[in-house]
Amino acid sequence: MKIAVFSDTHGSTARMLRAAGELRADALVHLGDCERDADCLERAFPELPLYRVRGNCDVSPRAPEELVVSFGGVRALLCHGHRYAVDWGRLDSLVYAAQEKGCSLVLYGHTHRAENAEIGGVRLVNPGTAGMGPARSFALVEIFENGGVAAEIRPL
């Protein structure tokens, strides 16, 4: 299962839509800022499941602040990350939250810095910003039948 993960688009959707169209992903994730940009994904790819959460710049109650989903048997925590102080470079509270929820994968955003790490048995993936700055990026996460997880940060 391939999952295209975007975050922090801040109204800039063209590159995100192009990448999503080229990937042939099985699911799409938008991790907030701006949550309404997820609507663009939904309209462009109505056949794909879309998972969304809101970020610190989002006010719409349509998207939850966080979400726990199962991708091919792998439990994942989806959140923007701002409530876990990820912008201070600390990921321990995010790892703890994932462990408490029985998740082995966390998809988060907020920092505008891509991250792909494993801490305490939890894979942490931040796709970076899809909408701001010169280093725009997204993540492609692959879930294998044996429960393995691979993640790759790709430029936009």
Q: What function would you assign to each model-found segment?
A:
Residues 42-51, 116-129:
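Short acidic, glycine/proline-enriched helix-loop-strand junctions
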Residues 29, 51-53, 77, 107, ...:
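Hydrophobic/aromatic beta-strand patches that form the interior of the parallel beta-sheet core
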Residues 15, 65, 72, 96-102, ...:
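Binuclear metal-dependent phosphoesterase catalytic core
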Residues 51-52, 57, 63-101:
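Glycine/small-residue-rich loop that forms an oxyanion/phosphate-binding "nest" at active or ligand-binding sites
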Residues 2-8, 75-81, 123-128, 151-153:
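Active-site-proximal beta-strand elements of phosphoester/diester hydrolases
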Residues 10-14, 35-39, 57-62, 84-88, ...:
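Active-site environment of divalent metal-dependent phosphoester hydrolases
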Residues 25, 103-104:
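Proline-aspartate-enriched helix->loop->beta-strand connector
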Residues 2-71:
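Core catalytic region of metal-dependent phosphoesterases/phosphodiesterases
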